[in-house]
Every structure is written in structure tokens, then in C-alpha cells.
Amino acid sequence: RIFDLAMAFVGFGWLDGVPMQNRWEALLAGYESVNRLSDVERAAMPAMHRYATLSIGAWRYWKHVMREPDVEFADRYLEMVDRLEVQFDFSEAVQ
């Protein structure tokens, strides 16, 4: 469950290399309107976000460098690498 939530935030929660707190809050509020996160899931969000970011970065590398080399998209995985260095406090919205 929380991996999907983390993947959604990786895909839609960033703008120009910056995680957007309001997008995280909206995503979480929508999710929790249907299904509340457990305390264990809340605590795991930073690790799941990192895992989701790495997963997308690895997929982009495989797709655009190894499987179907494409000069235009070959460096897209680096966006995910850069995100790994950015700190984001999920606990501000995770209550």
C-alpha cells in the first residue's frame, strides 16, 4: 500500500526538483479519506519514498540507456539520483 503512495508522490509530488509539501498533504489526505495508514506505515514512508525514487531511476536507466538507447532521454534517471539528496519531512503531514 505505502509503496504505491510513495510512487505517486515521486511522480506527482515534485516541481523543478523540489518536493512540494502541499502535494504530499493532498495526496495523503485523499488516500487516508479511504484507508488510514498504520503507525508502522507512517514510520516507513521515508524509506518507501527512497525505494520508489530508486525504482524509477533504475527503470529509466534500463529503459533509456540499456534496453532502448535514446540520447534524448538517456540522462533522465539522474533526476531521481538528484532527488535522493533532497531531505523531505513526511511527518509534517503524516499524523
Question: Residues of each region from the PLM?
Answer:
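All-alpha amphipathic helical-bundle segments outside canonical DNA-binding/catalytic cores
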Residues: 37-49
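Active-site activation/catalytic loop segments of kinase-like enzymes and analogous catalytic loops
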Residues: 2-36, 52-67
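ATP/Mg2+ or Mg2+-diphosphate-binding catalytic cores
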Residues: 56-95
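Gly/Ser/Thr-rich active-site loops/lids in small-molecule metabolic enzymes
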Residues: 1-5, 10, 76-84
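Residue-level recognition of alpha-helical structural elements
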Residues: 20, 41-43, 70-73
